[in-house]
UniProtKB/Swiss-Prot annotation:
Self-association and partners: Homodimer. Interacts with host UDG; this interaction inhibits the uracil-DNA glycosylase.
Protein name: Protein p56
Gene3D superfamilies in UniProt: 6.20.250.30
Claim: Zinc is one of the keywords in the record: no
Alphabetized UniProt keyword annotations: Early protein, Host-virus interaction
Superkingdom in the source lineage: Viruses
Homology family: Belongs to the phi29likevirus protein p56 family.
Role, per record: Inhibits the host uracil-DNA glycosylase (UDG), an enzyme which removes uracil residues from DNA by the base excision repair. Interacts with host uracil-DNA glycosylase and prevents the latter from binding to DNA. Since the viral DNA polymerase efficiently incorporates dUMP into DNA, the virus needs to prevent the deleterious effect caused by host UDG when it eliminates uracil residues present in the viral genome.
Length: 56
């Protein structure tokens, strides 16, 4: 079975920290890898933790 990770969907959880030291979570459900790349590239706050779960 050939798997194409670019066609799959992912749930993403990020713990972020702003310039004032405030930490907060962002949740994004059902992202493609392309969507994740855009999200990651556009995140201005520091990523403290990142979790990416493949949706089965």
């Amino acid at each position: 079975m050939v798997q194409n990770d670019f066609l799959d969907s992912y749930d993403v959880t990020m713990l972020l920290q702003d310039d004032n030291g405030k930490q907060y979570y962002e949740y994004h459900k059902g992202l493609s890898l392309s969507d994740f790349e855009v999200l990651y590239g556009n995140t201005v706050d520091e990523i403290i933790k990142l979790r990416v779960d493949k949706i089965s």
